[in-house]
């Protein structure tokens, strides 16, 4: 019994696991550059994705300093199945199935930023919305399907399934309002989400989030309306 208790305490000291938590008006805070602080999210996926939409808020001072990972979705087959990344020189980088597409940033923000990205296999069309404003549509990985059995991580870029983190690509700041759908939201629906709605996310829901924190990650009240 003593050995079992010790094993349990060791596991809980390494990470904190929470299931189905309502994260409304809260945010994950990554206070410093590391290669071991991140949040892993558990998604509800039963079949490969032929489309998706991911929306979230970020707040950071790193825009003019260096690149960093915003959202990293990896499978054992492909480390960058879905990637949302910021590059100081190229702007937002969206990736599907290991192929990346840059989107020029409309401006360098000094306040919290709301980001939505969507993609569909049938056309390959990939979209980026920044603070409710659509950027020029582009095409990427037409006919591709995003794999299941995924590791979804906030705060670090996965160069292998669930690992190979680089502190120079880590996120420093706040991430919140993370929602994901297995279909492409319409412009009207994107606007609803930007205005504070959720529109029933069915892959990841910020109002019922199953997550695990690792390293120095804190949960605090959000700093945006």
Curated annotation (Swiss-Prot):
SMART domains: PTX. Ca(2+) 2 binds at residues 159, 169. Residues 24-225 form the Pentraxin (PTX) domain. Homopentamer. Pentraxin (or pentaxin) have a discoid arrangement of 5 non-covalently bound subunits. Interacts with FCN1; may regulate monocyte activation by FCN1. It comes from Cavia porcellus (Guinea pig). One of its GO terms (molecular function) is calcium ion binding. Found in plasma. GO terms for cellular component: extracellular space. It is found in: Secreted. Residues 1-19 form the signal peptide. InterPro entries: ConA-like_dom_sf (IPR013320), Pentaxin_CS (IPR030476), Pentraxin-related (IPR001759), Pentraxin_domain (IPR051005). Binds 2 calcium ions per subunit. Ca(2+) 1 binds at residues 80, 158-159. Keywords: Acute phase, Calcium, Disulfide bond, Metal-binding, Secreted, Signal. Its cofactor is Ca(2+). This is C-reactive protein. Displays several functions associated with host defense: it promotes agglutination, bacterial capsular swelling, phagocytosis and complement fixation through its calcium-dependent binding to phosphorylcholine. Can interact with DNA and histones and may scavenge nuclear material released from damaged circulating cells. Belongs to the pentraxin family. The gene is CRP. It comes from the Eukaryota.
